[in-house]
Amino acid sequence: MAISILTVPCGAGGLNGSSSLTLVDIAELRQALNLSYESDSWQKEGGASKINTTVISGAPKITGLTEFKTYKVAATSDGKIVTVVTGGIGTTLKTGLGANKLSTFIETIGATTTKKLFHFNGYDPVQVWDGIAASTSAIATPPADWTSTSHPALGVSHNNRLWAFMNHRVYYSVLADHENFTGTGSGSLEIFPGEGEKIVCGISYANRLWLFKYPKGIYYVDDNNPDQTYWSIRRHNSEIGMSGPLGIALADLDVHFLSSEGRIHSLARVQEFGGITSGAIMPEKIGKWLRDTCKYSLFDKAIAVYYPYKSEIHFAVTDVSGSDNNRRLVLDLHDIETPKFRWSDRDTACSMSLFTDSNSKKKLMVGDAAGFVWELDTANKNKDSAGYNCIFETPEFSPVGLSELNPLGTGKVRVALQYLEVVFEPKGTHDLNVDVYGDGQYRYTVTFRMGESAGGAFGSFIFGTSTLGGGTISNTRRKLFGEYRRIKLKGYNNTANEDFSIFSMMLGYIAGSDRT
């Protein structure tokens, strides 16, 4: 009897958490944990290593993080601003700030037209540092109503001014003097005070200042005319908003953000005065999953950072039982026509930013809840020398009856499994385990060696390489057995410094018995 083959293309689809099976395709994944879609394959995501190998004194949460000039600058939960070096704290720039305040940083031009770093936390006076002085200083000329513990939580550099927000009002500095909010040319604007609770976020995009309110409301300021009397404020959308200041990222020519209702949106696709789902990225595939697995009440602490090296946006969020950002939902945009989601539970990211590594690449770094700053996506697939789980899991599918109406097959007849063949890039003489599920139950595990190019264990066939000792692409096959209506495959590896890169899986089968 001729063997039929069903090919599962790895890397063609991403995480799909839909509860409707009609919206799940065989190329998609029901679990994509600590996985990467590099090279349009399934790989273990890059590792993590400590930037400061000595803990910051007191082991505080890293509540804010940025790179400024040659420094890595962190705000900590014990009210400090410090530079971070291998040995922990390089310089303590400020003490005595409010405890446990989410901090934001913005680099812009100060009063002397030199680059300066501005720190906001919504509680203390805005801090300014030039990268030379031994400490930060409070902004010299704030608006009169920035007093006591009422201060902006975020600033935005836009059209050669610094802009900041409190309640329903946006403040702007003197042109080209970002420390001066009282001089000629400075001022403030009310943004639809009868709508939403307050402005929580802003970003400069497409030559406009965009403002987001909690729980709903997107607005923009058109300030392109040099005469301020001609500036205009417009409502863009009244049904979508945000929870906090950092859940937004500019990615090439678009802005992506996490809404207060747990959807990820493209600002370029949010229609003016549009409906609640306008601009949402695959809401049917990832929206419910995000809302079911993450804590709504902590969306105000969510952070989004665009990682240009791999064309990914990383959203740091908190799971339903957590108190800090302990999940990363990653939107992979390297194939802009087919965006894909994946997620990670490996790292705590109370703060997240980019930094420049020794090869001048912009890399991701996160600040945890225990006094450490970590580099992500390291070449070695370990976290501080320890292994971590990497799991891919297909939907449950039937090889028979696949169609547009039945994207996972009909399951009307049994098939007798013959083999599973994996096409992969050799990564080393270690194993990838694949659990085989039949009709909803775990049945057995098959193991694929990820580096041999010839020979193998009984029941394993390895072929397709160009030379002995390994090639760029290899195939390896394992015998399967059992008759089932529906099959699911779950692959995993959790060993330090072991990797895999799977391009496709081919399931060989023949017609099974007709017993019920």
Language model regions located:
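Beta-sheet repeat architectures centered on beta-propellers
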Residues: M1-L117, S238-V255, S260-T516
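Surface-exposed loop and turn segments in beta-propeller and other repeat-based domains
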Residues: P143-D145, L162, G185-G194, S278-S297
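Surface-exposed extracellular loop regions of Gram-negative outer-membrane beta-barrel proteins
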Residues: W210-N237
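Carboxylate/His-rich catalytic cores and anion/metal-binding grooves
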Residues: P152-D177
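Asp-box/WD-like beta-propeller blade repeats and closely related beta-sheet repeat scaffolds
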Residues: D130-V156
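Short loop/turn positions that demarcate and connect the beta-strands within blades
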Residues: A59, S148-T149, G194-E197, M242-S243
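Short, flexible helix-coil linker/hinge segments at the edges of structured domains or between repeats
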Residues: H168-G194, Q228-W231
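WD40 beta-propeller blade core
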Residues: V82, Q127, Y171, I218-Y219, ...
